[in-house]
Amino acid sequence: MPLTSWMPRGRPDAARPQGSVIEGEIVKMSPIGLRHAASVIALTRRLILAAGDRARLSPQNPVRLLGDTEPEPDIALIRPRADRYVRAPIGPRDVLLLVEVADTSYRYDRYVKLPLYARTRVREVWIVDLVHDVIEVHRRPSRDRYTSFAQVGPGDTVSPAAFPDIVLPVDDELLAH
């Protein structure tokens, strides 16, 4: 089902159903827990401060991957655009870094969403795994997977490929302890 089929008169600015749209299906996600929210808040703050005017940050907003796929990642670090995203939705080419914070949603984020991100050429995805206290860094999309993978944990640092000068410590604040 194309996304326009549930939009009044096909208007992209109309109210949309709650939840991600994955391959035409509306997927209701579990409510966000305290650790999940705290991690998103910490990452949002750090990325906004570090990126400054070089990028925009879109927390928990839809990203249009395909005609029938529009997930709502926890964070999308996106390129500035002249239209300020009023005329067209955020798409894969706009995304500099996409972040999914996962506790109960890890398997879904890793095995359903990540291949979709790779297939649509989202250049970099981080999965913040709150269960194992690590951040998975996925880069270089190829077909439905990423060819570069790294895992960082407490005491390490992580940097977006688009902004290697942004160095974030993987600490208790990011991992929400």
Language-model-derived ranges and their functions:
Residues M1-H177:
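Gly/Pro/Ser/Thr-rich low-complexity, intrinsically disordered segments predominantly at protein N-termini
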